[in-house]
Amino acid sequence: MAQVINTNSLSLLTQNNLNKSQSSLSSAIERLSSGLRINSAKDDAAGQAIANRFTSNIKGLTQASRNANDGISIAQTTEGALNEINNNLQRVRELSVQATNGTNSDSDLKSIQDEIQQRLEEIDRVSNQTQFNGVKVLSQDNQMKIQVGANDGETITIDLQKIDVKSLGLDGFNVNGPKEATVGDLKSSFKNVTGYDTYAAGADKYRVDINSGAVVTDDAAPDKVYVNAANGQLTTDDAENNTAVNLFKTTKSTAGTDEAKAIASAIKGGKEGDTFDYKGVSFTIDTKAGNDGNGTVSTTINGEKVTLTVADITAGAANVNDATLQSSKNVYTSVVNGQFTFDDKTKNESAKLSDLEANNAVKGESKITVNGAEYTANAAGDKVTLAGKTMFIDKTASGVSTLINEDAAAAKKSTANPLASIDSALSKVDAVRSSLGAIQNRFDSAITNLGNTVTNLNSARSRIEDADYATEVSNMSKAQILQQAGTSVLAQANQVPQNVLSLLR
């Protein structure tokens, strides 16, 4: 090797090696201080890219796990609200069962309906006000997508359904709706009800007042109707021209009449104070003249005492065929009803419903006036109409009865099959709750899987970018020794050119 001064190749070589050991020492210290094998892309370009992708996945999946927990919270919030809705529905069903019992009064039904209405309003309130982070979960149909992965499209959808009174089919639910009016209802629910029932007997038409029972003809100018005292037929004539049968007279009868023989036989066979019936009237034996049948009997007719005297039976003969009969008053028998009377002529009596029925009259429709309005009722009296529309009896808020037509009643009518309607609503709530319960379990599974994936990805990333302290400490020690040795050797290498000076001496 030539001895030169300008170029110290040994020094340059030593410096180069010293720089290398310096770089190794710097790298080892950086890794040991950061805990990472890859602190920049120069440390491991491919490894850095892989580790970075792992980091993205880990962070994304960690957030996805938190999202899934939010999904559970949403489902729990919604399911809790549905539980309260279910409780209210159960109470409504209980009240509906109570309402269907026939022993309830109008006030009972009103109280039941009032509580049902409050329960239904509470269902709507829960539906409108239940929310999670500002999102109303029961006020409308909605699909809420929960991101449960680190990439696009990795979602779980929560189906949120609108649950309120209307969607449950309970809008207008009523157990105390208007009742179809009957004639009996009109009479019992309103004051000063007037009107009449119509009847037809052949071609003849009649009206019967619903209050007094008076019978008149069904004409523009009605006439009062009577019963003919002689033949029982219906007539508009009230004349007194029907002769009654003169049964007991104030003049002595001829011997051996049926009446005289009957009374004499009763006296003969009885004793004073005994009673007996004759033609439906009770007589008392007042006096008895021996045992031949002569004597007196008495009775009360229309509040007046009548005495009958039996005489002319030969003493000891006891032949009632000889008996004569004399009355203290003239007594007649009505040809209409057979009753005893003091009038020799019977006046036609005012007709009654029973007289119409006796003449085979057939009932027709009725005209009922309530508060100035005239309503029509069918023959059975169980349907009342006005202008062709069926009428219903409704109650105001203060409990006062009022009449409304079928159009107004339609919006307030009692719910048909109320228990079936509530059961259907309960089934819908149960279906939504079941879906929410299933989605909670799915989120639990997703969270567990995300946790496992994050753990595995962290392990994989660690193997790529984390520093191996055993290796790096060894590398640092080696670099430190090389630094010390290199520094010492460099000092010696820098002294080599001075050997040339010895040649110049």
From Swiss-Prot:
Report the locations given in the UniProt record. Answer: Secreted; Bacterial flagellum
Gene3D superfamilies reported for this sequence: 6.10.280.190, f41 fragment of flagellin, C-terminal domain, f41 fragment of flagellin, middle domain, f41 fragment of flagellin, N-terminal domain, Flagellar export chaperone, C-terminal domain
**Broad class of the protein's primary localization:** secreted
Pfam families the record matches: Flagellin_C (PF00700), Flagellin_N (PF00669), FliC-like_3rd (PF22370)
Report a single Gene Ontology molecular function. Answer: structural molecule activity
* Disulphide bonds in the chain: none
InterPro entries from the entry?
Flagellin, Flagellin_C, Flagellin_C_sub2, Flagellin_N
| UniProt keyword annotations, A-Z | Bacterial flagellum, Secreted
Q: Which GO terms describe its cellular component?
A: bacterial-type flagellum; extracellular region
Please give the superkingdom of this protein's source: Bacteria
Q: What does this protein do?
A: Flagellin is the subunit protein which polymerizes to form the filaments of bacterial flagella.
Assigned protein family: Belongs to the bacterial flagellin family.
Q: What else is known?
A: Individual Salmonella serotypes usually alternate between the production of 2 antigenic forms of flagella, termed phase 1 and phase 2, each specified by separate structural genes.
What this protein is called in its record is Flagellin
Species of provenance: Salmonella senftenberg
Taxonomy, top ranks, is:
Bacteria, Pseudomonadati, Pseudomonadota, Gammaproteobacteria, Enterobacterales
